[in-house]
Each structure stands twice: as C-alpha cells, then as structure tokens.
C-alpha cells in the first residue's frame, strides 16, 4: 500500500510542478488559416497649418489634388500652379483582421510620402484600401492623431518624436469580407509559435486528455492536427475549449542574442557557462590634431605665414589580467559571473563569442 501511495504522491507533485509553468494553448499556438491581411492605399491629408507638401518638389501631390477636385465637379485650369501648403500626400496602411465583416472598423496608420513637415491637425480624405489582389476591402477617412510635437522660430526648431506619421483609431470601415477557412471536414491544424518538439507534444497530449485519445496528433515540431466535430456550428465552441487548455512549455533552447549595433545582450534562463579563465584588454586609439601657425619674426620681409598640422597619436591598452569565471547553472549565477569581469556591453560581445568558441558557453549564440 505504501508503494502505490508514494507513486500517487510523486505523480501529483510532478503534475503540480508542470502546471506551475503551464500556459494557455492560445498563447503558444495559432490556428492555421486564421490570420490578418495587409491593406494599403494612397490618399491626401488636408487641413495642415502650413506644414504640408511643397508642390513644386512633390508634383504628385498637386496631380492627386487636381484629380480629386475633378471627381467632385471642380475643374482646375491646365497648367495652373497651385501654391498649396495645407495638403500632403500620404500612404495609408491597415490590417484587416480575420473574420472581419462589412461595417466593422479597423485602425489605420497614415505616413507622409512627400516633404511635409508635419501631419499634426490634418484630416485624411476618403481613401480606398486595397489588398494584394487589387480589390478594395476598406475605406479610410478621419482626423489624424500625431504623437509628436514641434515648433520652430528664427531658424531654430524643436521636435519631439515623429511628426510625419499618425494613426486614426477605427478610421477605416470594412467594405468586403475575406473568407476564412480554418476547418475542413472537422480537421483543424494548430501552428506553434516556436518550433519545439517537447511543447508540441505536450499540447497534443493535453488535447487528448481533454477530448479523448486520437483527437490530436503532432505532425512535426510545429504543427498539430486536431480532429473536431463534423458539424460546423459546433466548431467555435470546440476551438474555444482547445485554446484555453493549459499546456506545459518545454524548457527552451539555451540562447544568447547579441545586437552588434547597440551592444545589447539578452539571454534566457537556460543559459549555462562552464568554468573558464578570461582576459580581455581594452585597446583605445586617441588621435589629437592641432594646427600650429608659424609667422616670420621680422616684419616687412618676404617671409610667409605657414600653417603646420601637429598630429599626436596615442595607443592605450588597459586591463588584460586573467580572471576566473566559475561554473554557473542558472541565470542569476551567469549574470553574477559575467558582471564580475567588469566588462562593458561592447566588450561582453567579444567575450561571449570567445567563450562559445572555447566551449565554455552552453548556449546558441545569435548575432542580429
């Protein structure tokens, strides 16, 4: 009796440990075929306070305005030079969400494509938004919300954030729906956000525990085949239960991400380092150039003033002593060990690469 009881206690303990790190399946995977569609359009923003396009440098703005006025029954004499300052040509983009129906609204992003100084306070005129098939799926119009601010006077200017782009919340009305087919004969395919055989297998096992064996099957490290009800009206309720299942995420692959442009270093909690000795010296080159002027000592002579450049180059190398890096099995110890080196983020890039080559860094190194 004691052995089965001990096994039961151990099973419950393992189950609790797995549930502590469990996540909803909807946060780990998406349904194949359920996605958004990109829309794009060209339009005009009016009502700017003298900060619009300079039509001489952006002739397409004047041409677009002329075409729009002609559609409204207003004829502009050919060859007329309109000096406009309150109009800007813009590109309008939006994402048509899945299952969107005509009459629903979506947010749009408006970006200047000319030389307008600011879109603040402008109004986007009616702009058709097209998909990749060149069909109109939404119509955008409304007042822009620009997050930046700026002012200029006397040749000086101050600007905060970006002024040539803005958003219109619920600024586009959907005119055409995109058919979304995600279930065929009751079969749905789930795509994991990250390729991981362990997490994919855990997700399939969680579905089978809830709905019975054979309901889900992992096809590879990313895709899961799920057999749902054949009745299409029952599929939404079934998928709602599937998405809310708790799935234990498998330990992630140890990885260190290095941004060589900014010097940023990011690592996950599974990174480990082995004991190693590290020596890294800072090599700096300082170049100082000053121009010295030599003039003749005696006035009223034929001597000439000569400018001679004086360049001084100094090469300095600091540090370089061997330092011991102890074995670290968790992220906190890894951070302490690397901080003990006293290296700057830029130095840390070279140190991590060298440790990876020496086999002391137990992680994948990815440079972006």
UniProtKB/Swiss-Prot annotation:
Domain of life: Bacteria
GO cellular component terms listed in the entry, alphabetical order: bacterial-type flagellum basal body, distal rod, P ring; outer membrane-bounded periplasmic space
Biological processes, Gene Ontology terms: bacterial-type flagellum-dependent cell motility
Major place of residence: periplasm
Subcellular locations according to the entry: Periplasm; Bacterial flagellum basal body
Source organism of the structure: Bordetella parapertussis (strain 12822 / ATCC BAA-587 / NCTC 13253)
Entry function: Assembles around the rod to form the L-ring and probably protects the motor/basal body from shearing forces during rotation.
Keyword field: Bacterial flagellum, Periplasm, Signal
PANTHER family linked to this entry: FLAGELLAR P-RING PERIPLASMIC PROTEIN FLGI, FLAGELLAR P-RING PROTEIN
Record protein name field: Flagellar P-ring protein
């Amino acid at each position: 009796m004691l052995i089965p009881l001990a096994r039961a206690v151990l099973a419950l303990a393992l189950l609790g440990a797995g549930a502590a790190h469990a996540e909803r399946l909807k946060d780990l995977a998406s349904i194949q075929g359920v996605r958004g569609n990109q829309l794009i359009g060209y339009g005009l923003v009016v009502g700017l306070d003298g900060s619009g396009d300079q039509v001489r440098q952006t002739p397409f703005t004047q041409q677009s305005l002329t075409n729009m006025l002609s559609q409204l029954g207003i004829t502009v004499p050919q060859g007329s030079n309109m000096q406009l300052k309150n109009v800007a040509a813009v590109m309008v983009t939006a994402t048509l969400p899945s299952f969107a129906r005509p009459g629903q609204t979506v947010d749009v992003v408006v970006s200047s494509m000319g030389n307008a100084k600011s879109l603040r306070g402008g109004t986007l005129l009616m702009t058709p938004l097209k998909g990749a098939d060149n069909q109109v799926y939404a119509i955008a119009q409304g007042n822009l919300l620009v997050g930046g601010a700026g002012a200029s006077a006397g040749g000086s200017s101050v600007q905060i954030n970006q002024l040539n782009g803005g958003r219109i919340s619920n600024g586009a009305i959907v005119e055409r729906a995109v058919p979304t087919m995600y279930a065929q004969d009751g079969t749905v395919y789930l795509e994991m956000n990250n390729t991981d055989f362990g997490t994919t297998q855990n997700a399939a096992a969680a579905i089978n525990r809830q709905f019975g064996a054979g309901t889900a099957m992992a096809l590879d490290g990313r895709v899961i085949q799920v057999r749902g009800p054949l009745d299409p009206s029952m599929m939404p309720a079934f998928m709602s239960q599937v998405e809310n299942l708790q799935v234990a995420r498998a330990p992630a692959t140890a990885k260190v991400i290095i941004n060589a442009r900014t010097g940023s270093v990011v690592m996950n909690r599974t990174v480990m380092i082995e004991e190693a000795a590290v020596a890294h010296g800072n090599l700096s080159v300082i170049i100082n150039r000053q121009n010295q002027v030599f003039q003749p000592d005696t006035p009223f002579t034929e001597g000439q003033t000569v400018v001679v450049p004086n360049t001084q180059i100094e090469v300095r190398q600091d540090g370089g002593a061997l330092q011991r890096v102890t074995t670290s099995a968790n992220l906190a110890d890894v951070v302490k060990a690397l901080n003990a080196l006293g290296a700057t983020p830029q130095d840390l890039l070279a140190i991590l690469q060298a440790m990876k080559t020496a086999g002391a860094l137990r992680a994948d190194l990815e440079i972006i």
